[in-house]
Amino acid sequence: MFYANMKEFELIKLVERLFGDEDVITPAGKHDAAYVKIGNRLIVLTCDTVNEKSDFPPYMLPEEMGWMAIAVTLSDVAACGARPLYFLSSISLKSIEFFEDILLGIKRCADRFGVKVVGGDIDFSEITTIAGFAIGEARRHITRRGAKVGEGVFITDLPGKAQLCLEMLERGAKREELPYAEKLYTPVPRIEEGMRIARYASAMTDVSDSLAVSLHQISQSSNVKIVLDNIVLSHLSPAENALELFLYGGGDFELVYTAKSSDDGIRIGRVERGKGVFAEIDGKTFEVEFRGYSHF
């Protein structure tokens, strides 16, 4: 993971221009996943890719690679408040030595959330790469668009933990020294929380690219201003860059959402008239940049 300019999001905008007018409820690029109507069922479709060069941290076991591949894909389903049903994967390896371990990781995560693994593909590659495709079913249509003035901004858990652990590894820390190793190696998609939140939230997305990126996406899609007025950094202590981690760190698979009230998350801000994302700390207000994790 690394902080970078928003080239990846520029590529997504290209996808929107080419495919964003398809005759579906929520087309490509508009949300974490696509919504399509099949009969009377509201179906959610999404895919994600992870590889050893840009996604797998040091000391990651093959079984954890499999877990991560399905977990990050299911996180997009969670951001729709949907129940995941089926999963397929395309696995590219330079050696079949750890193939079974990767499958076991996929199975562990799938079994935890009642997901059926129904197929996939195997290929050769110089770097281990796993692409996942998930199908889910939602009860209602919720996206990044819909936040309303006067609502609160909530998150299922405080962000920055995965990035903190990654930066500790990059400075020479051992895996057993990490305070939140599970956030980095076996992230848990917020499936149950997402289904509950979707019943009442006005907008929702996951924060895998960073809290800042996700809030900007909600702000732009909903045409509102978001102000963070309850920034908690104690969980990132004693990191000197705790605020940077909180706002711009990637790799957390929490859900951020807007609602009048909520018992499913931590309130971190409010929705106002206007545009952009801002933060209030010690009586001072500053603008939050559109910045976070990018593959490019």
Swiss-Prot record:
EC number of the protein: 2.7.4.16
Pfam families hit by this protein:
AIRS
Keyword match Coiled coil: no
Q: Which domain of life is it from?
A: Archaea
- What pathway does the annotation place this protein in? Cofactor biosynthesis; thiamine diphosphate biosynthesis; thiamine diphosphate from thiamine phosphate: step 1/1
Q: Which InterPro entries match?
A: PurM-like_C_sf, PurM-like_N, PurM-like_N_sf, ThiL-like
Q: What does this protein do?
A: Catalyzes the ATP-dependent phosphorylation of thiamine-monophosphate (TMP) to form thiamine-pyrophosphate (TPP), the active form of vitamin B1.
What is the official name of this protein in its record? Answer: Thiamine-monophosphate kinase
Organism lineage reads as: Archaea, Methanobacteriati, Methanobacteriota, Archaeoglobi, Archaeoglobales
**Name of the encoding gene:** thiL
